[in-house]
Swiss-Prot record:
This is DNA-directed RNA polymerase subunit beta. Pfam families: RNA_pol_Rpb2_2 (PF04561), RNA_pol_Rpb2_3 (PF04565), RNA_pol_Rpb2_6 (PF00562), RNA_pol_Rpb2_7 (PF04560). Its EC number is 2.7.7.6. It is found in: Plastid, Chloroplast. PANTHER family: DNA-DIRECTED RNA POLYMERASE I SUBUNIT 2.
Length: 1108
């Protein structure tokens, strides 16, 4: 929330601000910090030195973002850094080093990697610093303090049951704290002087032990004792003290402190605040006085004076943004560059020793692709770099505003307990208490509240100042989780109380992480907006306060799954945030300058002001990651005058600058012949032929033509039906605009048969010799569905483009340096076996499919009410109102009271009142104005609509909110009045065309030889447990035997059964055990159990033992 003092108004911050600010901070400051802190590298003789300059350059991308999507490339910029080589402290030579490519973030806060949009999810980890805890055991209490370093290392101090103080290195290794003190260079006088609670050391005989004093008097001796107590002994279980061993242990101890005791600036800040220290923030390593203060406070906690920490509190957690993650990866890449340069210098020194003369530094590789490799690995494999959910614009924003508790340095799904997943009071105004995934990640993935911001790694929330003694301070104050503990903050779902009403003198307030009722005079701050606590998805749900939290969670998640419809429609009932979501999504085309529209068509808008021409390119039928349509429709006519910031074109699922995810349709809550039982939904055929829920989906087909393998693209495909090739042009490519069916060829390809084909099928060689056929094989690309071809992209694969190197020539003095970098870059690509002649070609075919709603599709509302279409009724059979209008959808009324999402009823009735071209924008928690405010508003609007339309059935006093409707089949009135109205219904991405899957034969598991599970593996057709129960209930023994043996996992029998079915013969019996039975016997054998059976002859009663 931002406050403009001149206009005295508040504005909600941009929803993508956190991502954009984080990446800008990485480019401007974090990269600079890495190059400034890059150490000077020198050889052993100090003859050659290398160091980076801080004036790095990032070249503008040579390709547009749209072209990078088509060519499946990464939208990135090349990074060039000046470096200096100093020879014998005299000769100084400057070189420009190419360090790789850095992917760029677009205006939506996402990255384009290999033609796919990806997003880096923010992470919440434990903040570096010191944390105190109490472990209760049967024998007594153990007080511990854990020091978390900046790189994630931990150091644990503890007071055991016997009041002894230890530093624990691992679970089984601990050292006395006094030994650690002496190893850090302290003596007994300094320890006693700087420790307030000296009684904590009285239990030790160490202070009075003269022998131990003498042994620990020297620092190296203390370090020796430190590792001796850790158990670092040789094979003979004895330490042999020597100077070389002492030096080795000293280096080991120094490395130990640098790895586990590096606090960083944030850790130093937290340590100073917790222990009341005054050490500068630039001192990022642990000091001896820090350890003294840590132990002193630990003793204080054991006496009950200090307080233990709650690790789930947000003040103890750090927000890891995209800048922090990228900075960490660049640091790893620069470390590899450092090793590369050191190895090169060692090679030069060896050459110098062999030739016995001074050698100038030869061609050190002026190109290093370490940053490219590291960032490629990060964006491709890191768990926080995720494939962008792009079903609609709301899904993009919500995905970029997610915060993960998982990932490196965070929690794990298995070890995260209920306490870590639960809602903490410090989340108030920072994390949404509702929006989280369903399933095993529940509580581990959070979503930012709409007004939260990041400051120095911590989340802050704005509050309005109402205290009289703070009137001269700012009206809007951002408080961190550690600051709002000391203030009384009134909740946002209440208004300024009327002191004349005794019942309203106390206000619900948050104070010291608890929710209390406090008088208004004692309030310091208050929330300024009821939506301040929630995420964007939850804030779009009207009448949110009347829904159960779990249903609000489902409604928020299902809005992300809504498919953009062909004809978007504004919701009649909303919350007022729809325009802000559309504006910040990046899907709108916004005017960048004031002027008059000179030219406008479906793809381009040109505006002119005082001779300055601005051209805006629109998205035309582009594919998203979820195969939905991304398209912009212009509503800026020619010669129209526009202002800066005015909307020129709407994006997908948008209308008039507002996000429109669904359609306003007429619904009724009533049972209908059992077709809407449970979550089934009955719809009218009007939704189909009026294209109410019709959506476009774009599928991308891709194929590669490798000319190195003599693969070619052609229309002449032998032994293939001409009908399937009817859409190909002379080059073998499908024509744009063609209507293709499943099985039609999109790209005609031929390649020579390999030697493996002839060895696998010898008859191919015989046919070639007999009939003189050409040894070729068709590898055509075929369509899997029907649709219209809207685009064909035929491009050649190139390893890189050197044109952007020329853009670095900003100074004449550096032109020759960039020429050297260009030559070195070409050498590196040749060494990596990149073929610069581009011997491969790639073809992308985009198929547009128009999908109407049908049986099996999933639809939902914004209140967690979801269901599957079970039947499509004709218009005349649908129930109709007293005005003759037939219903569009019939929902089950039993789904409302059991799930406690009454908000859909308020929306439905208010939507009926808003059919007279009215739109309502109602923020949640309107009950803060008066009791039953929502109900009064709905009934009042219904009463007004009844009078304006002269339809008394809209508002009937006998049954408020209900009306009598007629059966479309008989024309009779239903016995009971029914709740009817206009609800905003969404069509979800879960559609029957994508879910339907069937197979006859397919892949089998290697061990059990049973069909694999899942559509993605090509599996299916399994006889499950419930199907076996059904067969058992009917007693079909022979069918059960077939299904469980010869038709399941008997390899030889299931091959014979197909032939027997075709020939009409009886089903063959299994002559041996099935594969799953063999697996069972082997598992029993592994348990030392032998499985066998015995046959008893009926005539002679002989025993014949047969092993399985």
């Amino acid at each position: 929330m931002q406050f403009d003092e001149k206009k005295e108004m508040f504005t909600i911050p941009e929803f993508g601000q956190i991502q954009l600010e984080g990446f800008c901070r990485f480019i401007e400051y974090d990269l600079l910090d890495k190059f400034v802190k890059f150490p000077k590298i020198a050889n052993t003789q100090k003859e050659v030195e290398f160091l980076f300059d801080k004036n790095y350059k990032i070249i503008e991308p040579s390709i547009k973002e749209k072209d990078a999507v088509y060519q499946r490339l990464t939208f990135s910029s090349k990074l060039f850094v000046p470096a200096f080589f100093i020879y014998w402290n005299k000769i100084k030579k400057k070189k420009i080093i190419y360090l790789g490519e850095i992917p760029l973030m677009n205006n939506n806060g996402t990255f384009l990697i290999n033609g796919n949009y990806r997003v880096v999810v923010n992470q919440l980890i434990r903040s570096p610093g010191i944390y105190y805890s109490l472990e209760r055991k049967r024998t007594g209490n153990i007080y511990t303090s854990t020091l978390i370093s900046d790189c994630g290392g931990r150091l644990k101090f503890e007071i055991d049951i016997k009041q002894n103080i230890w530093i624990r290195i691992s679970r089984k290794k601990n050292v006395s704290i006094l030994v650690f003190f002496f190893a850090m260079g302290l003596d007994i006088e300094e320890i006693l002087k700087n420790t307030y609670y000296i009684k904590g050391f009285e239990g030790w005989g160490l202070i009075c032990n003269e022998k131990l004093k003498h042994k620990l008097s020297r620092k190296k001796g203390a370090i020796f004792t430190f590792y001796e107590e850790l158990g670092s002994r040789g094979d003979n279980n004895d330490f042999v003290f020597s100077e070389s061993l002492s030096e080795s242990l000293y280096k080991k101890f120094t490395n130990f402190l640098s790895k586990r005791c590096k606090l960083g600036r944030i850790g130093r800040r937290n340590l100073n605040k917790k222990l009341n220290l005054e050490i500068p923030d630039n001192e990022i390593f642990l000091l001896p006085q820090d350890v003294l203060a840590i132990i002193d406070y630990l003793i204080k906690v054991s006496y009950g004076v200090g307080t233990v920490d709650n690790i789930d509190h947000l003040q103890n957690r750090r927000f890891f943004s995209v800048a922090d993650l990228l900075k960490k990866e660049v640091g790893l890449a620069l470390n590899r560059v450092k090793v590369l340069i050191q190895k090169t210098m060692q090679t030069i020194e060896m050459l110098r020793k062999k030739q016995n003369k001074r050698i100038m530094l030869p061609e050190i590789p002026l190109v290093s692709t370490q940053i490219t490799k590291t960032l490629k690995h990060f964006f491709g494999l890191h768990p926080l770099s995720q494939f962008l959910e792009q079903t609609n614009s709301l899904a993009e924003i919500l995905h970029a505003r997610k915060v993960s508790f998982l990932g490196p340095g965070g929690l794990t799904e298995r070890t995260a307990n209920f306490r870590a997943r639960d809602i903490h009071p410090s989340y108030y105004g920072r994390f949404c208490p509702i929006n989280t995934p369903e399933g095993q990640n529940a509580g581990l993935i959070a979503s930012l509240a709409i007004s939260a911001r990041i400051n120095f790694g911590f989340l802050e929330s704005p509050f309005y100042n109402v205290a009289k003694k703070y009137q001269k301070a700012k009206k809007i104050v951002y408080l961190s989780p550690s600051e709002d503990v000391y203030y009384r903050i009134a909740l946002g779902n209440c208004l300024s109380v009327d002191q004349k009403i005794p019942e309203k003198k106390n206000t619900p307030t948050q104070y010291h992480q608890e929710f209390l009722s406090i008088a208004w005079e004692q309030i310091h701050f208050r929330c300024f907006l009821p939506l301040q606590y929630f995420s964007i998805g939850v804030s779009l749900i009207p009448f949110l306060e009347h829904n159960d939290a779990t249903r609000a969670l489902m409604g928020s998640n299902m809005q992300r799954q809504a498919v953009p419809s062909v004809q978007p429609e504004k919701c009649i009932v909303g919350t007022g945030l729809e325009g802000q979501v559309a504006l910040d999504s990046g899907a709108l085309a916004i005017s960048t300058q004031e002027g008059r529209i000179q030219y406008s068509d479906a793809a381009t808008i040109v505006s002119v002001l005082k001779g300055n021409t601005t051209q805006t390119e629109l998205q035309i039928y582009q594919r998203s990651n979820s195969n939905t349509l991304m398209h912009q429709k212009t509503h800026a006519s020619q010669a129209k005058y526009v202002r800066k910031g005015q909307i020129l074109a709407d994006g997908a699922a948008m209308l008039g600058g507002e996000i429109c995810l669904g359609k306003n349709i007429l619904v009724a809550y009533m049972p209908w012949q059992g077709y809407n039982f449970e979550d089934a939904i009955l719809i009218s055929e009007c939704l189909i032929y009026k294209d109410i829920f019709t959506s476009f989906h774009i599928t991308r087909y891709e194929t590669t033509i490798c000319t190195a393998e003599c693969e070619k693209m052609t229309r002449e495909i032998p032994r293939l039906a001409t009908y399937s090739l009817r859409h190909l042009d002379k080059n073998g490519l499908v024509r744009v605009g063609s209507w293709v069916q499943p099985g039609d060829v999109l790209v005609g390809k031929l390649r020579p048969r390999s030697s493996e084909d002839f060895s696998r099928f010898p008859e191919l060689r015989l046919l070639q010799d007999l009939f003189c056929t050409s040894p070729i094989k068709e590898t055509c690309l075929r369509a899997n569905g029907k649709g219209r071809v809207i685009d064909v992209n035929w491009s050649k694969l190139q390893a890189f483009c050197k044109d952007d190197l020329e853009k670095g020539h900003q100074d004449d003095d550096t032109e020759d340096i960039y020429d050297e970098a260009e030559d070195a870059l070409e050498k590196v690509y040749q060494l990596n076996n990149y073929n610069l002649s581009s011997d491969s070609e790639k073809v992308h075919v985009y198929l547009l499919e128009k999908r109407k709603i049908q049986v099996g599709d999933k639809v939902a509302g914004r209140h967690g009410n979801k269901g599957i279409v079970s039947i499509v009724l004709s218009r005349q059979d649908m129930p109709f109102l007293q005005s003759g209008i037939s219903l569009d959808m019939v929902l089950n009324p039993l789904s409302v009271p059991s799930r406690m999402n009454v908000g859909q009823i308020f929306e439905c009735l208010l939507g009926l009142a808003g059919t007279m071209n009215k739109h309502y924008r109602i923020p949640p928690f309107d009950e803060r104005y008066e009791q039953e405010a929502s109900r009064k508003l709905v009934f009042y609007e219904l009463y007004k609509a009844s009078e304006q339309t002269a339809n008394p059935w809209i508002f009937e006093l006998e049954h408020l909110g209900k009306t009598q409707i007629f059966d479309g089949r008989t024309g009779e009135i239903f016995e009971q009045p029914v709740t009817t109205g206009n609800a905003y219904i969404l069509k979800l991405i879960h559609q029957v065309n994508d879910k339907m899957h069937a197979r006859s034969t397919g892949n089998y598991a290697r061990i059990t030889q049973q069909p694999v599970q899942g559509k993605s593996k090509g599996g299916g057709q399994r006889l499950g447990e419930m199907e076996v129960w059904a067969l058992e209930s009917f007693g079909v023994a022979y069918v059960l035997r077939e299904m469980l043996t010869v038709k399941a996992d008997h390899i030889r029998a299931r091959k014979k059964i197909l032939r027997s079915i075709l020939d009409g013969h009886s089903v063959p019996k299994a002559d041996s055990a099935t594969e799953s039975f063999r697996v069972l016997s082997k598992e029993l054998n592994s348990l030392a159990l032998e499985l066998n059976h015995t046959i008893i002859s009926g005539k002679y009663f002989n025993l014949d033992r047969i092993e399985v």
